[in-house]
């Protein structure tokens, strides 16, 4: 993304963020992307005080992940992030993860919204601009469709415990991938690494509350649904394997 306005950080895959394959967990990859996105904003003066003064906040509405090779434990990776101007109430942010040698490892396509924290409503565009922060257009994108399926199998209930919640007091967006993977049969996640995920965030799950989790096979992957108070809290579509399926290439 060198031809676009972007921001790059180098990170190291921590042991505590690695799974049984000694590779970075997908949820941890989302956390790393979340961090570099926040650092990008702060580098342009958009810190907590900036948003507090403007009574606004960024929220993630949906995001998708494509993995070519998940980085391994202790591997150094580069995260390059770039965002578009707001279009139809959302801001696209692309984050490309590469190795030290330039190998493209993964891509995250995240769609952000801006919220008026006083009025409690989503805005079409923010009431402010930051010079040189955004791009007019980022042509690359990932499929954001969550392939639903029936019948659903119950996978239990998860409580929004202290360790799952972030500085906003609800389950961190990245951890819904853990919840989704935990819902599936163990042989599914053992058979092959995650190659694609798309997730939609419908309702926050505040600390102390619970979410009921369900799953179903869907085409070449799996559909996972989380419900809170009889309403969808999140929906996720997951594929496991070394290559993306034909359905995702359309």
Regions found by a protein language model. Name each.
Residues 2-60, 107-109, 115-196:
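Hot-dog-fold acyl-thioester-processing enzymes
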